[in-house]
Curated annotation (Swiss-Prot):
Encoding gene (name): rps4
Main location: plastid
Name of the featured protein: Small ribosomal subunit protein uS4c
Chain positions covered by the region annotation Disordered: 20-43
GO MF terms, alphabetically ordered: rRNA binding; structural constituent of ribosome
Alphabetically ordered keywords of this record: Chloroplast, Plastid, Ribonucleoprotein, Ribosomal protein, RNA-binding, rRNA-binding
Length: 201
């Protein structure tokens, strides 16, 4: 299954808030989000819906998400927590969480177009797994600085997660550590995602 490129609000109405996909919100009047939240979701539907939340928030194909689930399953510890850590430490997500891009698709575009440096080297792979002590900067071009500077000004001024440090005047971000689960911005029951894939096996 390919990466979704259709209307983003359509997904938000069905799955509710996905900050990585879009910062837009459906109109409050007759908002299907409010209607669907009061409707009891069957156990049959809830697992695939949680899986879809993860897919659309992080902008993954079905094959990519399955690959991450398998990697998490082979690691020691909670498969669900490790899965979220793997996704949060992707370069495109790190750029989004730093505020250098307003969405994860926007961050992916910055990476693909070679605007991003990791430890002073151009990295054009959005799935690159960041690690503690990585330094994220941008190429020294006027266009890159203007674009990312605008994103930094427009990004929501939420508290920066403790695994990251941003030096906005230098267009630089630091990865301090692996993310702690309490700083994951997506409201998700990751265990249901793991259960979904275990039932598919």
């Amino acid at each position: 299954m390919s990466r979704y490129r259709g209307p983003r609000l359509k997904i938000i109405r069905r799955l509710r808030t996905l900050p990585g996909l879009t910062n837009k919100r459906p109109k409050s009047r007759n908002d299907p989000t409010n209607q669907s939240s009061s409707r009891k979701i069957s156990q049959y539907r809830i697992r695939p819906e949680e899986k879809q939340k993860l897919r659309f928030h992080y902008g993954l194909t079905e094959r990519q998400l399955l690959k991450y689930v398998r990697i998490a399953g082979r690691a020691k510890g909670s498969t669900g927590q490790i899965l979220l850590q793997l996704l949060e430490m992707r370069l495109d997500n790190i750029i989004f969480r730093l505020g250098m891009a307003l969405t994860i698709p926007g961050a992916r575009q910055l990476v693909n177009h070679r605007h991003i440096l990791v430890n002073d080297r151009v990295v054009d792979i959005p799935s690159y797994r960041c690690k503690p002590r990585d330094v994220i900067t941008i190429i020294d071009q006027r266009r890159s600085r203007a674009m990312i500077g605008k994103n930094l000004d427009l990004s929501q001024k939420d508290q920066m997660p403790n695994h990251l440090t941003l030096h906005s005047s230098q267009y630089k971000g630091l990865v301090n550590q692996i993310i702690d689960s309490k700083w994951i911005s997506l409201k998700i029951n990751e265990l249901l995602v793991v259960e979904y894939y275990s039932r598919q096996a």
